[in-house]
Amino acid sequence: MNLPFRKRDYSCLTRLTYKYFVAPERTAEIWQQLEAELGPIRRLDSVRVQQISSAHLIVRATFDGNPITLMQRTPAVDPALLARVHAIFGFTEEPTEEPPP
Protein backbone atom coordinates (compact mmCIF):
# COMPACT_ATOMS: atom_id res chain seq x y z
CA MET A 1 0.00 0.00 0.00
CA ASN A 2 1.32 3.44 -0.91
CA LEU A 3 1.68 6.11 1.76
CA PRO A 4 0.10 8.49 2.47
CA PHE A 5 -3.47 7.27 2.26
CA ARG A 6 -6.64 7.87 4.23
CA LYS A 7 -9.65 5.96 5.52
CA ARG A 8 -12.98 7.40 6.57
CA ASP A 9 -13.70 6.93 10.28
CA TYR A 10 -17.41 6.32 10.66
CA SER A 11 -17.17 5.69 14.42
CA CYS A 12 -16.35 9.31 15.23
CA LEU A 13 -18.98 11.78 16.44
CA THR A 14 -18.03 14.32 13.81
CA ARG A 15 -19.38 13.46 10.38
CA LEU A 16 -16.26 14.17 8.33
CA THR A 17 -13.42 12.33 10.05
CA TYR A 18 -10.54 10.59 8.30
CA LYS A 19 -7.46 8.72 9.48
CA TYR A 20 -4.38 9.59 7.44
CA PHE A 21 -1.57 7.05 7.35
CA VAL A 22 1.77 8.70 6.57
CA ALA A 23 5.35 7.50 6.16
CA PRO A 24 6.74 6.92 9.69
CA GLU A 25 9.97 8.77 8.90
CA ARG A 26 7.93 11.94 8.12
CA THR A 27 5.79 11.93 11.27
CA ALA A 28 7.80 14.48 13.33
CA GLU A 29 8.16 16.82 10.33
CA ILE A 30 4.42 16.61 9.59
CA TRP A 31 3.48 17.47 13.19
CA GLN A 32 5.86 20.47 13.15
CA GLN A 33 4.22 21.72 9.96
CA LEU A 34 0.71 21.12 11.35
CA GLU A 35 1.64 23.12 14.44
CA ALA A 36 2.87 26.01 12.27
CA GLU A 37 -0.34 25.91 10.19
CA LEU A 38 -3.01 25.19 12.84
CA GLY A 39 -1.66 26.09 16.28
CA PRO A 40 0.07 24.54 19.29
CA ILE A 41 0.19 20.82 19.99
CA ARG A 42 -1.44 19.79 23.28
CA ARG A 43 -0.18 16.55 24.83
CA LEU A 44 -2.74 14.65 26.91
CA ASP A 45 -0.49 12.41 29.01
CA SER A 46 -3.36 10.55 30.69
CA VAL A 47 -4.48 9.05 27.36
CA ARG A 48 -1.14 9.34 25.46
CA VAL A 49 -2.66 11.54 22.76
CA GLN A 50 -1.37 14.67 21.06
CA GLN A 51 -3.86 17.09 19.56
CA ILE A 52 -4.14 20.40 17.75
CA SER A 53 -7.50 22.19 17.97
CA SER A 54 -8.22 25.02 15.57
CA ALA A 55 -11.45 26.84 14.82
CA HIS A 56 -12.31 24.42 12.00
CA LEU A 57 -10.24 21.27 12.53
CA ILE A 58 -9.07 18.89 15.24
CA VAL A 59 -5.94 16.89 14.44
CA ARG A 60 -5.15 14.02 16.79
CA ALA A 61 -2.84 11.02 17.13
CA THR A 62 -1.25 8.85 19.77
CA PHE A 63 2.19 9.95 20.96
CA ASP A 64 3.88 8.11 18.07
CA GLY A 65 2.02 10.53 15.77
CA ASN A 66 0.72 8.08 13.15
CA PRO A 67 -1.99 7.57 11.93
CA ILE A 68 -3.27 11.12 12.14
CA THR A 69 -6.99 11.64 12.69
CA LEU A 70 -8.43 14.76 11.08
CA MET A 71 -11.89 15.87 12.26
CA GLN A 72 -13.79 18.73 10.67
CA ARG A 73 -15.46 20.78 13.42
CA THR A 74 -17.62 22.70 10.97
CA PRO A 75 -19.28 21.37 7.83
CA ALA A 76 -18.02 24.25 5.68
CA VAL A 77 -14.25 24.04 6.13
CA ASP A 78 -12.37 26.26 3.68
CA PRO A 79 -11.17 24.01 0.83
CA ALA A 80 -7.89 25.97 0.77
CA LEU A 81 -7.24 25.00 4.42
CA LEU A 82 -7.87 21.33 3.65
CA ALA A 83 -5.59 21.61 0.62
CA ARG A 84 -2.79 23.03 2.81
CA VAL A 85 -3.21 20.21 5.36
CA HIS A 86 -3.26 17.62 2.56
CA ALA A 87 -0.06 19.15 1.16
CA ILE A 88 1.58 18.79 4.59
CA PHE A 89 0.60 15.10 4.63
CA GLY A 90 1.69 14.67 1.01
CA PHE A 91 -1.83 13.41 0.30
CA THR A 92 -3.62 13.78 -3.01
CA GLU A 93 -7.26 12.90 -3.49
CA GLU A 94 -8.04 9.40 -4.61
CA PRO A 95 -8.58 9.29 -8.36
CA THR A 96 -12.16 9.06 -9.48
CA GLU A 97 -13.15 6.94 -12.40
CA GLU A 98 -14.36 8.90 -15.37
CA PRO A 99 -17.25 7.43 -17.34
CA PRO A 100 -16.18 6.18 -20.77
CA PRO A 101 -16.72 8.70 -23.63
Residue ranges and their predicted role:
Residues 1-101:
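Structured alpha/beta or helical-core interaction and ligand-binding surfaces enriched in interleaved
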